[in-house]
A protein has these predicted regions:
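Short, well-ordered coil/turn elements that cap or connect secondary structure elements
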Residues: 2, 98-100, 146
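Short, low-complexity N-terminal intrinsically disordered segments enriched in polar/charged residues
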Residues: 3-56
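Conserved aromatic-histidine-acidic binding/catalytic patches
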Residues: 11, 15, 111, 129
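Alpha-helical interaction segments
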Residues: 12-13, 71-72, 90, 131-132
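A solvent-exposed, acidic/Ser-Thr-rich amphipathic alpha-helical stretch
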Residues: 36-107
Length: 162
């Protein structure tokens, strides 16, 4: 008897919201570590390794504050955006080192498929003085071979102002 049974995990809204919270918490943690370069570097690498899919293939990452090197298609490019200190991305000052005291996601909508999902909305970054910065996002997610949810699309932009 050969039962060829496959178990599939369907991506849920809870999965998306958990990864969004983990991403925001990691960004806040990076800012709190900015005076300890080694710990900050380790946390940045951990964030990217845990949540992004660079080790699985292409990641399309367009950060908010990137003009000269707009697209971060490599692990090193993403890391530089978050914590700076990379001469190949000299415009980067380290977005996560602002620092931020809170990051809150507000999904406008989410498209859920069996092995992939897309979320679009606004996220809100709170500065130490309480000022809140609103940023628009689109994130794409996929399940890797271990059924871990990973980011393979990340586009951020500041809202249009006329």
């Amino acid at each position: 008897l050969n039962l060829n049974i496959k178990f599939y995990t369907m991506i849920t809204l809870d999965n998306i919201e958990n990864v969004q919270k983990e991403w925001g918490d990691s960004l806040v943690k990076l800012g709190s570590l900015k005076s300890n370069k080694e710990a900050c570097n380790n946390e940045a690498e951990s964030l990217i390794n845990r949540l992004y899919g660079y080790q699985n293939g292409t990641v399309l990452f367009k950060p908010t504050k990137a003009k000269d090197n707009q697209f971060r298609l490599t692990f090193e490019g993403a890391k530089s955006y978050f914590i700076g200190e990379n001469s190949n991305f000299s415009e980067d000052k380290g977005f996560a080192l602002q620092p931020w005291t809170n990051v809150r996601f507000e999904n406008a909508s989410v498209i859920l498929n069996e092995k992939s999902a897309t979320a679009m909305g606004n996220y809100f970054f709170t500065e130490p003085n309480g000022n809140v910065v609103k940023v628009e996002y689109t994130f794409g997610y996929f399940l890797d071979s271990n059924q871990d949810l990973r980011i393979n699309l990340h586009h951020s932009s500041l809202p249009y102002s006329n």
